[in-house]
């Protein structure tokens, strides 16, 4: 199987122009950051909102890149560097997608694509851990799941036997683009919630956008869905076109979590009352996430023992229910990468099942909710009260709705702040040994500053 890409291939794929260099040169590793260039990388100059990376092609060549793919930039003087190459294209973002698709089509391997309103990155991490027990597997790094990050993941394919990619979206058409590049053999949809509802208008529209992942699914491909999600359950019951495998806790499904227990070490359950699964994170959300990995593992012929081992040993990506023990004796649950109602609910569920001292929730604004912002922040407040949070601290304008709803539902110890620094001062004063602290908000709230302060 020839998986190599040459300069000539790139020119043909992108309709680009070779400014200078050898068209037979092999292009193996790609980078978009001149500060992270390794010897013989191919630098791709991407155009951002403020600048065009193509202008820094010389820096890339000096750093060791063997060639560059750049945009047509008005007034840019292209200097000839012996032994290097320069390809000029109309749009480097579009080009990197085209090259990634070309690369993907050279591989006849399982490609698992994951999308959903919440739990994508964690589910990807668990599935990767399970599939890796049998196959040499590549996965999306962190959450590089958009029209730039995902193509760069595909371009990292080497001698891999399986690929696990995460696909994110906040508008129609985005998953359609990604799935037609990745061409998955297995599509996993974790749930349809309220993330990006401000952009898409309704949960039904979110479902429609998530189902775009099926447009690139290979002909004999399989769809794996959370059968307890109301919209996915309805879609599945009406589906007669795709091969579907279901998982769940409540609705009858192909793979069900039964005899669920929450222990000091995490979560434990049996699959259809048979093999036991241990998840090193507490909470119902991770029972669901790990069940999807059971489905994928079974489909790819991973043994029961290796499925259980992969789930028990998986490692979470940064800032996703990352449980850290402080030197001062309290525990911090760092889940501050992003937030929507469904992920807030899952995080609070995890907090409620932790054993120790007081349960403190530090919650901030959730973005991209549009006209649903007030309602969904209030719902989070209600959940915080129902999950018996001992102390609630909110930061931000929208998060005041969380505080008000929590108070209305019986939670007494509540502190609201407009500024992070004021919240941090308060937190430091009230924290005690054995406390368990959840830190969660949308990424733009910069809640990682709270975690650093703790």
Where are these regions (language model features)?
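Mobile, glycine- and charge-enriched loop segments
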Residues: 34-45, 137-138, 148, 152-163, ...
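N-terminal leader/targeting and accessory segments in enzymes
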Residues: 1-95, 256, 354, 382-383, ...
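Phosphate-binding loop of NTP-binding sites
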Residues: 9-12, 93-227, 231-241, 429, ...
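ATP-dependent carboxylate/acyl-activation modules
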Residues: 114, 120, 318-322, 444-452
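Active-site beta-alpha connecting loops in nucleotide-dependent enzymes
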Residues: 48-51, 317, 336-410
